[in-house]
Design a protein with these regions (language model features):
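Secretory/periplasmic and organellar redox-cofactor proteins
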Residues: 2-10
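Short, basic/aromatic recognition patches
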Residues: 11-32
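Short beta-strand scaffold segments in enzyme catalytic cores
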Residues: 34-40, 46-47
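A short, polar/charged loop-to-alpha-helix boundary motif
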Residues: 51-71
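Acidic helix/loop or adjacent segment enriched in Glu/Asp that either coordinates divalent metal
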Residues: 70-92
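Mobile, glycine- and charge-enriched loop segments
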Residues: 87-119
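C-terminal binding/interaction regions
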Residues: 112-113, 118, 127-131, 135-150
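Conserved small/polar residues in nucleotide/adenosyl-binding loops
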Residues: 154-157
Length: 157
C-alpha cells in the first residue's frame, strides 16, 4: 500500500486506492485479486472484491481455477469464471442514485507475490460503470504514491 512521504499527507486518490487494494486482499480468486471502492463527495458509498457469489464455493477454498487449468489469459474465458468482478460487487451494493457522479477506484494484486497488477475494467464492467453514472475510474498502476491512471472506459472487446 502507498504511504505518505515524510510528514506529507497522502493524497485522496492514493487513500481510496489503498482502500481498494485492502479489499483486493479479501478476494477469493486464485488467479488475480481485485478490489473496488465507490466514492461520492469524499464519502465511501460501496466496496467490492472479486469472488464467488454469496453461498457458493470459493476457488481459493476449492484450490482450483478453470481458467488456469485451461491456460487462459486475462480477458479470455470469463464465462468459465465463477467470480463476480470487484466493480460489479461494488455496484451491486449501492443504488444508481448514489453512483451518479461518483468515482470508482480499482486495484489489482498478483496472488503469487502480492505485486500490483495493472487493473482495467473489462468490457462488461465498463458498460455497467457507464450505466451507473460513475464519473471517473482511477486505476492503481504502481506501488508508489501517484502511480495511478484515470481510465477511459471502453465498451466493446
Amino acid at each position: 500500500m502507498v504511504g505518505p512521504e515524510g510528514t506529507k499527507r497522502i493524497s485522496k486518490i492514493d487513500t481510496y486506492l489503498n482502500v481498494a487494494e485492502a479489499f483486493a486482499y479479501r478476494s477469493t480468486c486464485i488467479k488475480r485479486k481485485y478490489g473496488a471502492v465507490i466514492v461520492k463527495d469524499d464519502v465511501v458509498i460501496s466496496t467490492g472484491y472479486n469472488g464467488s457469489p454469496r453461498g457458493y464455493d470459493n476457488c481459493c477454498d476449492l484450490g482450483v481455477c478453470p481458467r488456469i487449468q485451461l491456460g487462459m489469459h486475462q480477458g479470455e474465458g470469463y464465462g468459465l469464471c465463477r467470480a463476480i468482478h470487484a466493480e460489479q460487487n461494488a455496484l451491486l451494493n449501492c443504488s444508481r442514485e448514489q453512483t451518479i457522479g461518483a468515482d470508482l477506484y480499482l486495484a489489482g494484486i498478483n496472488p503469487g507475490d502480492n505485486s500490483i497488477h495493472r487493473a482495467k475494467p473489462c468490457p462488461l464492467c465498463s458498460r455497467l460503470i457507464i450505466q451507473a453514472g460513475i464519473q471517473n475510474v482511477y486505476l492503481r498502476v504502481g506501488a508508489k504514491a501517484g502511480e495511478y491512471e484515470v481510465c477511459l472506459l471502453y465498451t466493446s472487446p
